[in-house]
Curated annotation (Swiss-Prot):
InterPro entries named in the record: Hepatitis_core (IPR002006), Viral_capsid_core_dom_sf_HBV (IPR036459)
Natural source organism: Hepatitis B virus genotype D subtype ayw (isolate Italy/CI/1992) (HBV-D)
One GO biological process term: viral penetration into host nucleus
Gene for this chain: C
Record flagged with keyword Repeat: yes
Region (Disordered): 136-183
GO molecular function annotations of the record: DNA binding; RNA binding; structural molecule activity
Protein name: Capsid protein
Cellular localisation: Virion; Host cytoplasm
Basic residues composition bias: residue spans: 149-176
Gene3D superfamilies named in the record: Viral capsid, core domain supefamily, Hepatitis B virus
UniProt keyword annotations, A-Z: Capsid protein, Cytoplasmic inwards viral transport, DNA-binding, Host cytoplasm, Host-virus interaction, Microtubular inwards viral transport, Phosphoprotein, Repeat, RNA-binding, T=4 icosahedral capsid protein, Viral penetration into host nucleus, Virion, Virus entry into host cell
Protein origin, superkingdom: Viruses
Modified sites of kind Phosphoserine: S155, S162, S170
Keyword Phosphoprotein: yes
């Protein structure tokens, strides 16, 4: 069976594979982050979101994998075999869990669309030959797309002040909702 754990979230294993393995924090750091940010929601019997559910499952599976690794460590007497098993788990399974945990924590933190846009932008950047791409990789942030970054060396253009507008004589309208109350 070819199961892609990211498909229902609009991403793919291939899309995450563009990020180098050293990009992802350690499983321990990711578990600490998930616990610090989302412990209450993860331990709640209530359904919060598909990302919370996926994160719960990944955390439980990692715990089971560590139980198995401990068992193997205790029961495999051949040190070379034990080292091979530990190396395989850390290299292959560890990376998959680091990717999975990072993806769902990032989606909860930044929003799914932002994370998908980042993965696509990074994928385009990494596949562009170095001579034709910007020196710095895209970064995952919450800054809006409309942020303008000025080039160094140029002085900013002086703007002429705009003429003052006449205020209307009618009373000011109030907004029906404040920005903070919107989700």
């Amino acid at each position: 069976m070819d199961i892609d754990p990211y498909k229902e979230f609009g991403a793919t294993v291939e899309l995450l594979s563009f990020l180098p393995s050293d990009f992802f924090p350690s499983v321990r750091d990711l578990l600490d982050t998930a616990s610090a940010l989302y412990r209450e929601a993860l331990e709640s019997p209530e359904h919060c979101s598909p990302h919370h559910t996926a994160l719960r499952q990944a955390i439980l599976c990692w715990g089971e994998l560590m139980t198995l690794a401990t068992w193997v460590g205790v029961n495999l007497e051949d040190p070379a075999s034990r080292d091979l098993v530990v190396s395989y788990v850390n290299t292959n399974m560890g990376l998959k869990f680091r990717q999975l945990l990072w993806f769902h924590i990032s989606c909860l933190t930044f929003g799914r669309e932002t994370v998908i846009e980042y993965l696509v932008a990074f994928g385009v950047w990494i596949r562009t030959p170095p001579a034709y791409r910007p020196p710095n990789a895209p970064i995952l942030s919450t800054l809006p797309e409309t942020t303008v970054v000025r080039r160094r060396g140029r002085s900013p253009r002086r703007r002429t002040p705009s003429p003052r507008r006449r205020r209307s004589q009618s009373p000011r309208r109030r907004r029906s909702q404040s920005r903070e109350s919107q989700c």
